[in-house]
């Protein structure tokens, strides 16, 4: 169920402060965050935000199409290595 419109978007306060400070300083440095739950707002456009995936920070460049989504959607937490082909060595007849 999506978030109610009357509540507005949720952005962690510490992350929003970093974004506003970067906008005022006209800085394009990478902003490191652990806040995967924060929604992408228009103030973040053009910034690169390094989102933590549980092991390392994955850089995410914010574009217009990402507004309204959450940061965690762009940093997958699980690595898929593919399905195993038929293992004929382990099979007995």
UniProtKB/Swiss-Prot annotation:
It comes from the Bacteria. GO terms for biological process: ribosomal small subunit assembly; translation. GO terms for cellular component: cytoplasm; small ribosomal subunit. InterPro entries: Ribosomal_uS19, Ribosomal_uS19_bac-type, Ribosomal_uS19_CS, Ribosomal_uS19_SF. Pfam families: Ribosomal_S19 (PF00203). GO terms for molecular function: rRNA binding; structural constituent of ribosome. Keywords: Ribonucleoprotein, Ribosomal protein, RNA-binding, rRNA-binding. The keyword Lyase does not apply. Belongs to the universal ribosomal protein uS19 family. Protein S19 forms a complex with S13 that binds strongly to the 16S ribosomal RNA. This is Small ribosomal subunit protein uS19. It comes from Leifsonia xyli subsp. xyli (strain CTCB07). The lineage of its organism: Bacteria, Bacillati, Actinomycetota, Actinomycetes, Micrococcales. The gene is rpsS.
